[in-house]
Structures are given as C-alpha cells and as structure tokens.
A protein has these predicted regions:
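Short acidic-hydrophobic, aromatic-tinged amphipathic segments that line or gate anion-handling sites
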Residues: 52-62
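Short glycine-/small-residue-rich Rossmann-like dinucleotide-binding loops
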Residues: 68, 74-76, 97-98, 122
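Rossmann-fold NAD(P) dinucleotide-binding segment
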Residues: 61, 65, 77-92, 105-108
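NAD(P)-binding Rossmann-fold cofactor-contacting core
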Residues: 19-47
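A short helix->loop->beta-strand "cap" motif at the edges of active sites that frequently abuts
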Residues: 23-24, 88-91, 114-115
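An anion/phosphate-binding loop that grips the pyrophosphate of nucleotide cofactors and donors
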Residues: 66-67, 114
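Glycine-rich adenosine-cofactor-binding loop
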Residues: 1-18, 30-35
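Adenosine-phosphate binding glycine-rich loop
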Residues: 99-176
Length: 176
C-alpha cells in the first residue's frame, strides 16, 4: 500500500490497510523534506507485524510504481499523484484528503482510466475539489459517481482485470 501524506491521517490509513488486507510493504511519501525516521518507526511498531516493511519513498512516482493500493491523505491544493495514466493504471486509489473545493490530490489522468468514482455521500461532489473541479471542467458528470451504499447493496463483484483502475473519494464518513 502507498500512503501520500505522513501525518496522522496517513498513519492510521496505513495501519487500517494492514489490518484489512494482506500488506507486505507500506510505501510512505511526504511532499516535504521532513525527516520521517521517527514516524516510520512508530508506524512499524503500531503495525506490529514483522512481515510488513515500512519504506519511505523519495518521490510520488516511486510510491505509485510500487503500490497496488494508494491512499492520499493530504490538504494539498495541487495533485499529489503524478499525472501519468501509465503509472496509475490498475491501481486502487483512495482519496482521503481534499476536503474543500479548493483542494486537490488526484490528477486529471485518472479520468482517462476510469469513468466512475465511488463516494460516501452526494455532497462529496460539492465539498471536494477532487470532484467539484473535474465536474466544473466537464471531465466528470455527477451521474458517474456511485454511492458506496448503492454499490454494496448490489452484488459487488471482485475486480479481476489487473488494468482496471478504481477510485474512491472519501469525505470523512467513518463507515467506509
């Protein structure tokens, strides 16, 4: 799993991912040059599994390249992931940050890879810049958003296509 953002939210997303899935390596990328030695040690201790390595990545590209699941947990106003559809293809992207219309973590390349985004609540389309900006620019239509409750109430199928990119935009509802 790759984590963009070495703050409290990133810490707990990494921890939860390791509980929910069989993760062998957590790749952490932070946009600043802050020394993450203590952060990585605390995360490794909290995960409490000697089979899970915690690795700091120098670039977002390195983190994305090495990760199947990517969680973005930043207050950025610019995309934190590379705008490279080849790098993003086949990834599961979970965007946790971007909680105002001015914030943005996810690049436009995502819309070349998927025509749908899973959301918790309809107001995500207004609240998050990751959705409101692409809607305003015509790259995303509100009809392309799928409520997680609707998806889960259906008969969700396991995604077996390794090239399929999935995108979930969270606005902070703790259920998902």
């Amino acid at each position: 799993v790759g984590i963009a953002g070495a703050g409290v939210q990133g810490f707990y997303q990494a921890l939860y991912a390791c509980v929910a899935r069989p993760i062998d390596t957590v790749y952490v990328y932070n946009h600043s040059d802050r020394d993450l030695t203590d952060y990585l040690a605390r995360l490794e201790k909290a995960i409490d599994n000697p089979d899970v390595k915690v690795v700091q990545c120098k670039t977002a590209e390195e983190m994305v390249k090495n990760s199947e699941i990517i969680c973005t947990t930043t207050p950025s106003t610019q995309p934190v992931l590379p705008d490279d559809k080849d790098l993003l293809e086949g990834k599961c992207i979970i965007a946790i940050g971007s909680y105002t219309p001015e914030m943005r973590e996810i690049p436009d390349a995502i819309w070349d890879l998927t025509n749908e985004v899973y959301i918790e609540l309809p107001y995500a389309c207004e609240e998050s810049g990751d959705l409101s900006q692409p809607i305003k620019d015509g790259r995303l239509k509100e009809e392309q958003t799928i409520l997680m409750s609707d998806y889960l109430a259906g008969n969700p199928q396991e995604i077996t296509d390794p090239k399929k990119t999935t995108y979930f935009k969270s606005v902070g509802m703790g259920l998902f």
